[in-house]
Amino acid sequence: MAQFVYTMHRVGKVVPPKRHILKNISLSFFPGAKIGVLGLNGAGKSTLLRIMAGIDKDIEGEARPQPDIKIGYLPQEPQLNPEHTVRESIEEAVSEVVNALKRLDEVYALYADPDADFDKLAAEQGRLEEIIQAHDGHNLNVQLERAADALRLPDWDAKIANLSGGERRRVALCRLLLEKPDMLLLDEPTNHLDAESVAWLERFLHDFEGTVVAITHDRYFLDNVAGWILELDRGEGIPWEGNYSSWLEQKDQRLAQEASQEAARRKSIEKELEWVRQGTKGRQSKGKARLARFEELNSTEYQKRNETNELFIPPGPRLGDKVLEVSNLRKSYGDRLLIDSLSFSIPKGAIVGIIGPNGAGKSTLFRMISGQEQPDSGTITLGETVKLASVDQFRDSMDNSKTVWEEVSGGLDIMKIGNTEMPSRAYVGRFNFKGVDQGKRVGELSGGERGRLHLAKLLQVGGNMLLLDEPTNDLDIETLRALENALLEFPGCAMVISHDRWFLDRIATHILDYQDEGKVEFFEGNFTEYEEYKKRTLGADALEPKRIKYKRIAK
């Protein structure tokens, strides 16, 4: 194979109004290299992948793959034939093998004809068997089932037209991986995957022999799979040979040499670096340490010190000893049992990470805690001092015609944030909307910017118990890191639905895991500790994702 599978020479891209989103990028990609692409929202990461996939040709410079290289591209919103079933969509990826198997059956049937040209049939049989052998085609059904389980695809006969956006993405990703291209271009491949499927994808891409260029905020992927980090910063492409942890070290050193305005960002990076350097044992004691120092987190002096953080979660009323108690909870939808006999109690200071397949009932639990839905049986008891800040309050009610500042402030110069008052522009600035960005229309925002705006609206309530439903979706790593640091310093409790394992390892003191047939397990510890516990008690197979099974309600 050639030395490089893809080369870019002085590539630039201008977007309205005359903004150079990419400038003078010259890069060469080695065969088999695994590259993670980092950068703030709006830095041009998706644009870079569209250029590499040959979709965006309106560029300066030259972007050229090696001849005969097969490129597979996963956009954020993949297009599938709405008339097809899941099975038909997936089989498109292996159509050569499917057609060969079908034709081989026909050839076998033709042997029964005494007038057949047996030499011609034998030659065709040999050619078909060669195709099938090369792709392990006789085990095709096993391969498809394994891939469908790993990415938790909907039923084979489900119509694409009836699937959610997340389900379509999983089907598109599965199809792409089965195509086995020479180079994979993946735009946020972990979005809409649960933590177990993300871990499976990480192992798959680690063993994949081709080149991978992935935009992702999944830092375990960037640490365990990526051999290169490509950072897009103010239009420049800055390559770094090494994984995420080593990139973080050099980034910290680089920021140390830059202007003092980077001080807050450097402080945020140093907190994450401290966690990385502790190793597994030290990391696992962090959750227990948080519970132990809850009183310190609550002190006014401590909160004042942390107001300079990049993202500051305003404290709500002081929490009493009783936070949340769930007893014998049961909830079904139609004939599906989502939650069966769930009981747990949350201590003050806890941050509970909630994991499990999409559609298992994680968001339903939030709606029951906030009183929007009622359980079939069992009780949910909130402590008297608990003030909820629930993620569903604002998610779908943002006005696209308003500016960022208007959407958060309601046009007020001074805002009430929890129990305190502060200038509204200063509060909005805490969510990395600085200066002119506060004048952007909501409808013009990227997914990550909408995520930050949503957090700004949610957190102004000043609750002491946060319910966060996939807050990490679409956030760039800078904002993710800031959110982690803010949660770790927050003098309250939080329940967080997330598939981001690094995020869960840094913040979670407990894990709530949705499993098959309505079973939900409550565990004290972070995500990695929970994985180790599952391996010890159930064996390594317990970590392999499978399509969810719902217990049916007896009629």
From Swiss-Prot:
Effect of E470Q: Causes growth defect at 18 degrees Celsius in bipA deletion strain
GO CC annotation terms, alphabetical: cytoplasm
Biological process according to GO: negative regulation of translational elongation; translation
Main location, first listed in the record: cytoplasm
InterPro entries: AAA+_ATPase (IPR003593), ABC_tran_Xtn (IPR032781), ABC_transporter-like_ATP-bd (IPR003439), ABC_transporter-like_CS (IPR017871), EttA (IPR022374), P-loop_NTPase (IPR027417)
Binding site for ATP 2: G356, P357, N358, G359, A360, G361, K362, S363
Enzyme class at the top of the EC tree: hydrolase
This protein's UniProt keywords: ATP-binding, Cytoplasm, Hydrolase, Nucleotide-binding, Protein biosynthesis, Repeat, RNA-binding, rRNA-binding, Translation regulation, tRNA-binding
Annotated positions binding ATP 1: G39, L40, N41, G42, A43, G44, K45, S46
PROSITE patterns the UniProt entry points to: ABC_TRANSPORTER_1, ABC_TRANSPORTER_2
Domain remarks in the Swiss-Prot or TrEMBL record: The arm domain is inserted in the first ABC transporter domain. Probably contacts ribosomal protein L1.
Name recorded for this polypeptide: Energy-dependent translational throttle protein EttA
Source species: Escherichia coli O6:H1 (strain CFT073 / ATCC 700928 / UPEC)
Gene designation per UniProt: ettA
